[in-house]
Amino acid sequence: MYEKINEPLSIRGLKLKNRIVFAPTTMGLSEEEYLERLGIIAAGGAAMLVIGDVPVLRHSLFAKSLYSTKGFEFYRRVTEVIHKNGAKACAQLHVSDSDIKGMLRFVPGMLMKRITPDRLRELMNERTGPYITGIPESKIGKITASFGDAAVLAGKAGFDMIQVHGDRMCGSFSSSVFNHRTDSYGASAANRAKFACECIAAVRQALPDMPVEYKLAVRQENPHYGNAGILVEELPVFLPLLEKAGVDSYHVALADHSSLSDTIPPKSHPYFSGEGCFLKYCDEVKKYSSLPVCAVGGLTNPDFVEEQLTRSRIDYAAMSRQLIADPEWPNKTAGKNQDKIRFCVRCNRECLGGMMEHRGVHCIYDKKKEDVQ
């Protein structure tokens, strides 16, 4: 048994039974398939499942709203199936930084297949800066307050933790690549942190006892990776402000608005090819914060994960592709079956590939099981 992997962790009173969590993942599955998949992953021994992209606004084009009866019931079923199978549930609250009205102009091209998903991503990224820079301050206050409202509903739906999504709009406000404002929400690193801090503070004020994690989206230069999120060199400015606002832990990842193959890197990636490919960002966070840090990105090998935990390089580990490849990874590392782990090979063929082709997130191992049957 791996002792450190299976050591409990407490975050603001929430006890996680081990150090492994399921990272927020867009699945693209039907509702029933999605719930079944969550149940399988929870039963596999993960301490907590983070449910990605739960919208804080009343209306959302891409995800169910907590404010609607149908949406609230869906999230209640999500937490129910997770709890039933022995894990905790975390809601990743977010607000999109996409200019939805501007996006409508691209719909005909998408329908006619003249615009590919990758090209659409580029077009939307081009509009992010002007959109973020142009949001009126009066609207910003309503958006940040909605994080508190959504957090209350998430708590009522049964979630045990809130994660504030530090990418999307929080990340774009944080980044000088997109944020060209000259008011109190821009023009300096401290000002660019203000939006995220107000979102966190709204959650903390609404739910004083709820553990709050921040998805810390980090970007870098030389070489350039990530566009939204916090520049590595600006972490000393951002982290104290985020913690003053009420953060309890960090979930550290590469910032968005670059290629999906950067944020979800395959093993062939020219820069992020190794095991634990984003750990160097965790190292930077640890320099300036004593809060628990969760790593994500290419974590598959239990020996490697155990070593990072033992060295206190990280405090817990998030996995997506590995737990899709083998949901029993946590259970196997808790017993004597680690030699039977199906390791993710980071090919991205059926997971990221399935999502991009609107087939849903699956795994090459699924095909092998079908062939055996």
Swiss-Prot record:
Its EC number is 1.3.-.-. Its cofactor is FMN; [4Fe-4S] cluster. It comes from the Bacteria. The keyword Iron-sulfur applies. It catalyses: urobilinogen + 4 A = (4Z,15Z)-bilirubin IXalpha + 4 AH2; urobilinogen + 2 A = (4Z,15Z)-mesobilirubin IXalpha + 2 AH2. Pfam families: Oxidored_FMN (PF00724). Belongs to the NADH:flavin oxidoreductase/NADH oxidase family. This is Bilirubin reductase.
